[in-house]
């Protein structure tokens, strides 16, 4: 495959004002995408949605202009969760959906992500075609062929109804008090409606976006405010989304954090008990070994994908399985959505809790997270640690010392000059010793 110049594993992302996250580039990207979609024989319309970053207005206008110059009609959704844009792209029968967001990053970052007409990630060939057109100068189509732009005023309502449709009609949240943390992000105006309309008493924090406060000490990457609110309100559960709404983490009534690994186990184990799992479960290289061991105990197959929801989806599709996820709170539930969806994932977990007749704490007790420790070793330049004989030998010795109940992972960061050294096992002391020894070997082996 040709090396991509702009697209990473999850679109294009960077700091606002630094190439390629500039209005000039976004204008060109809109035009290039329009050319690629038209030549792929796709429908002549594209949806654009964004999160609540101030820079989103600027990039929305630039993309709109570029697409119109290519002769493509544009529908503007305004601030909407990333999975909502995937869903609406399908229901509007659009050529593609474009998301302007940098997910859980601070406001000074932004990015672009594309969805296909089916609401899935664009295939590699189409991304390569967009990059090919980015190398060409913009040529505006004939005046009578220019694209038109319009706003979709009922986008939030459409998505709220979709979220509710993913649970049975008889399911309600009556008698439940929830605290929602919307990260001052894209879920701020839809998530409260979903849970209130299903009968919950809802307290909301992180729902006053000002363009600069997205993810700032709130949301799934900063659970402190949610813990405090759950305690103060004596709520049953806290639910935290990230800035673009494709992740979810929870806080139990006792203030304990419920991460993506535990949510994945709760969902998978309850579906297995109901006979609705339909296969195994996909995690990632970073998924806690406790998940794998607990699922094995109840007869559920488990497979690890590379880190990233795109790779989780690839393995789910390859196996024709339904459920996968990451510790960060990205969960893919294929019989509900085409991509990770924080609100839908939260509803599915709450459905599992209600159906089980147990508390969240009782369901979590089915798995024990093993002690895990990671050290990031900074290197002059990234290299494959498994290509060094001294590192491989040290890793083999460490694995032998941990036995079957332990796991070691060495991998290069995809974005920074770091080698990540991670280990899991039964003993925290043993894990710490093993990771520190391996990190020292990696440091000495650095070129």
Swiss-Prot record:
Cofactor(s) the protein requires to work: Mg(2+)
Enzyme Commission number: 5.4.2.10
Catalytic activity entry: alpha-D-glucosamine 1-phosphate = D-glucosamine 6-phosphate
Transmembrane intervals: none
Active site annotation, chain numbering: 103 (phosphoserine intermediate)
Keyword Transit peptide: no
Role summary: Catalyzes the conversion of glucosamine-6-phosphate to glucosamine-1-phosphate.
Protein name: Phosphoglucosamine mutase
Pfam family, one: PGM_PMM_IV
Gene: glmM
GO terms (BP aspect): carbohydrate metabolic process; peptidoglycan biosynthetic process; UDP-N-acetylglucosamine biosynthetic process
Residues annotated with Phosphoserine modification: 103
Entry binding sites for Mg(2+): 103, 242, 244, 246
GO terms of molecular function: magnesium ion binding; phosphoglucosamine mutase activity; phosphomannomutase activity
HAMAP family reported in the protein's UniProt record: GlmM_B
Gene Ontology cellular component list: cytosol
Record family assignment: Belongs to the phosphohexose mutase family.
Keywords: Isomerase, Magnesium, Metal-binding, Phosphoprotein
Stored CDD domains: GlmM (cd05802)
PTM comment: Activated by phosphorylation.
């Amino acid at each position: 495959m040709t090396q991509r110049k702009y697209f990473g594993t999850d679109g294009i992302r960077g700091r606002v004002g630094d190439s390629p996250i500039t209005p000039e580039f976004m204008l060109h990207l809109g035009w290039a995408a329009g050319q690629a979609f038209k030549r792929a024989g796709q429908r002549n319309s594209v949806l654009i949605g964004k999160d609540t970053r101030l820079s989103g207005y600027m990039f929305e206008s630039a993309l709109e202009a570029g697409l119109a110059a290519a002769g493509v009609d544009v529908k503007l959704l305004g601030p909407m969760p990333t999975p909502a844009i995937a869903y609406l792209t399908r229901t509007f029968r659009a050529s593609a959906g474009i998301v302007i967001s940098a997910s859980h990053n601070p406001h000074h970052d932004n990015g672009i992500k594309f969805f296909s007409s089916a609401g899935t990630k664009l295939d590699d060939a189409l991304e390569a075609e967009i990059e090919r057109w980015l190398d060409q100068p913009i040529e505006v189509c004939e005046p009578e062929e220019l694209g038109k732009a319009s706003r979709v005023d009922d986008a939030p309502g459409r998505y709220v109804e979709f979220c509710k449709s993913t649970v049975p009609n008889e399911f309600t949240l009556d008698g439940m008090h929830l605290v929602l943390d919307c990260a001052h992000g894209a879920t701020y105006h839809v998530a409260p409606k979903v849970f209130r309309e299903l009968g919950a008493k809802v307290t909301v924090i992180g729902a006053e976006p000002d363009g600069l406060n997205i993810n700032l000490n709130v949301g799934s990457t900063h659970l402190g405010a949610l813990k405090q609110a759950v305690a103060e309100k004596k709520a049953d559960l806290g639910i935290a989304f990230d800035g673009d709404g494709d992740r979810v983490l929870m806080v139990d009534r006792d203030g304990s954090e419920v991460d993506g690994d535990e949510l994945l186990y709760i969902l998978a184990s309850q579906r297995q008990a109901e006979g609705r799992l339909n296969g195994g479960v996909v995690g990632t290289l970073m998924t806690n070994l406790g998940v794998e061991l607990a699922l094995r105990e109840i007869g559920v197959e488990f497979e690890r994908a590379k880190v990233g929801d795109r790779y989780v989806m690839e393995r789910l599709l390859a196996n024709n399985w339904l459920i996968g996820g990451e510790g960060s709170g990205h969960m893919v539930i294929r019989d509900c959505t085409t991509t990770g969806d924080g609100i839908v994932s939260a509803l599915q977990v709450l459905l599992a809790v209600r159906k089980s007749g147990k508390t969240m704490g009782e369901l979590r007790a089915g798995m024990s997270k093993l002690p895990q420790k990671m050290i990031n070793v900074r290197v002059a330049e990234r290299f494959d640690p498994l290509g060094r004989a001294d590192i491989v030998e040290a890793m083999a010795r460490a694995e032998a010392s941990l036995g079957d109940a332990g796991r070691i992972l060495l991998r290069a960061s995809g974005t920074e000059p770091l080698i990540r050294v991670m280990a899991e096992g039964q003993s925290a002391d043993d894990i710490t010793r093993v990771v520190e020894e391996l990190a020292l070997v990696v440091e000495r082996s650095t070129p």
